[in-house]
Amino acid sequence: MPLRLAIVRALVAIAVLGTIPSPAAAALQRSYIPLPEVLTDPNEGNTYGFLPVVLFLDQQKIIKYILASDVRYNHITGVYTSFRLFGYPSIARKWSVVLRKSQNIDEDYELRYEDNAFWQDRVRVFGDLEYEKDSSERFFGFGNGSSEHDESNYTANHLEAVVWLAYRLQPTFSLTYRSRARVFRVDKGGVDTLPFIGTEHPGTPGLGGATIIGQEFGFLYDTRDDTNIPRQGALGVLTAEIVPRAFGSSLTFTKYGAEARKFIPFRERFVLAMRARADYIDGPDDIPFFEQNSIGGHESLRGFGSGRFVDKDRFVASAELRTRVYQREIFGVDAQLELAPFFDFGQVFHSWRSSPFNDLHAVGGLGFRGVVPPQVVGFVDIGLGAQGVAAFTGLEYPF
């Protein structure tokens, strides 16, 4: 795929240039953190590896760069090598470059940029370009009651570009616009013990892949004190995305979304974080399964694997008590440890006429968060649902 090769080469060039120390970067302090990796994921299983992290700090001991390359092993991916470079030029801006390649199927190349104070603080900008092959993806069929016995596997092979803008009309109110282009293909998966999705679910729409070109318009209300590590305030979002065949998409449909978040601090060390979201799709029955709404994974129902339940519409809600239990200087930075007991609820359904609350899946669990103000959050979330325990790791809060 020539386009894929061009993107990979561009990201490699950016990564190489990013590791060349500028005069400013050479003056930064460095802190080295050797970390063993023992990870578990409902879809990928157990992963073991070594993650040597290098922190680049300014004179105020604020992180400016993180170099986090690793080598890991998983029985699905084989040996998986990664290069990750994260940049934090200011409190309002951050960027990242990720290059990952396994010895088997999986690979991931991503370039991301975010600026919350663009054009004299009047515009928020987000951009993401990613090519990924994930051979551990699962599909159980459609519906809120899809059975574990219908589990199938496939490789998600997709290229996606996203640009998101928010123009501030007032300090707390913005108009938003998002444009995305996605090319998705379904290939044979990497889990030999599971049937291929095309064999287990032969009538599933989207097995032949699809091209999606979407234009989203919305309203944003935001009174949070911080977009990275919020402690108080609220967030409200209303969006409508048009995906027309006339713009090059494989079919025509419309997506609607609404989300509310609330953050309540008390007794200095505690923040009660709450979130509720509803998503609806208006369109034909042959909308590809990978474009329909789903619950499961680290951002929604943390006791189930990613995309465990799939259908046209969904409702999710979460609440967690972010509790700072420890704080000290570690590896040259002011680090905080948070414990966050949480509860997640969610349901998918086929029609807007259906109740989004009559058959909710519930998950309870505990999150471990490493917080380095003003921007960096790492998490390990362990959830218990009806199908057992699931664990997720990554960067940034789930909401």
Question: What is each of the regions a protein language model found here?
Answer:
Residues 199-208, 212-337:
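C-terminal outer-membrane beta-barrel translocator/porin domains of Gram-negative envelope proteins
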Residues 9-19:
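Bacterial N-terminal signal peptides
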Residues 34-36, 67-71, 97-99, 125-129, ...:
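Membrane-embedded beta-strand positions of outer-membrane beta-barrel proteins
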Residues 322-361:
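C-terminal hydrophobic structural anchor segments
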Residues 22-26:
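Sec/Tat signal peptide C-region and signal peptidase I cleavage site
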Residues 27-34, 39-211, 377-378, 385-399:
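Gram-negative/organellar outer-membrane beta-barrel architecture
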Residues 192-203, 288-300, 347-365:
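Solvent-exposed, glycine/polar-rich loop segments of beta-barrel outer-membrane systems
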Residues 30-32, 44-48, 77-81, 105-109, ...:
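Residues that define the transmembrane beta-barrel architecture of outer-membrane proteins
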